[in-house]
Amino acid sequence: MLLSLENEVDPDARYLGDALRSLLGEHATYDYVREGGRPALDRFDDLDGVVVGGSTAGVYEADDHPWMAEEAAFVRELVDREIPVLGVCFGHQLVNEALGGRVEHHGLAHRLVTADLADDPLFDGVNRTIPAVHGDRVVDPGDGMAPIAATDDYRYFATRHRDAPVWTVQYHPEFQHDLLARIREDFGWTDTDRSWADVTTARTLRNFERLAAAHSR
């Protein structure tokens, strides 16, 4: 079973978290924005791993959102206990910052990009054409985190811990073509000559589920 951490501060943008969870198998949800603190891991039987979800907030806004520091502490606990973690978009940034990295605002990007993907099991079946919607970037990775994907202007598009079973991706695996109209309305969208037919990012979630389950055996 996976634990999904909900981090969205804007109720009108929570559809992305809903879309992500619709692609997961058995899972529970913990809403950090509304609950704060930390999940009691002993509440969750057969926990395989944790998915740290996205948010329209930035990790540098922790003074306005005290739950961010609490979640960062929880992430460090997960890393120390070697519980598998997947950080998605804001989660990518939070995990890296929690481990001593640095995140900066770079302006909103919204287009299909071509990524160079490392030979990593997280990317099994994931094509290089990836939808990107984000305004912030990891500019220095956290301690132990190494890049496993990059675009032409973003070196740390995805990262993996050298020792613990921790992966993070800047992209939203749940962002498929059926969400494009909503994303275009809410965030804008730049059309390119890349094709949505080549987008297979949802496989990232299935791969993480498989990796997390294998680790917990």
Give the predicted meaning of each segment.
Residues 18, 22, 93, 135-136:
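Active-site phosphate/pyrophosphate- and oxyanion-stabilizing loops and adjacent acidic/basic residues
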Residues 53-120:
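Cysteine-nucleophile active-site neighborhood
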Residues 1-67, 77-83, 189-217:
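N-terminal beta1-alpha1 cap of cysteine-dependent amidohydrolase-like domains
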Residues 96-176:
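Pocket-forming structural segment of enzyme catalytic cores
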Residues 17-18, 64-67, 100-103, 145-146, ...:
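Short, glycine/charged-enriched secondary-structure capping and boundary segments
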Residues 46, 65-72, 149-153:
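Charged helix-capping and loop-helix junction motifs
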Residues 155-217:
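C-terminal and late-domain segments of enzyme folds
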Residues 13-14, 61-62, 95-98, 142, ...:
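Short glycine-/acidic-enriched loop or helix-start segments at secondary-structure transitions
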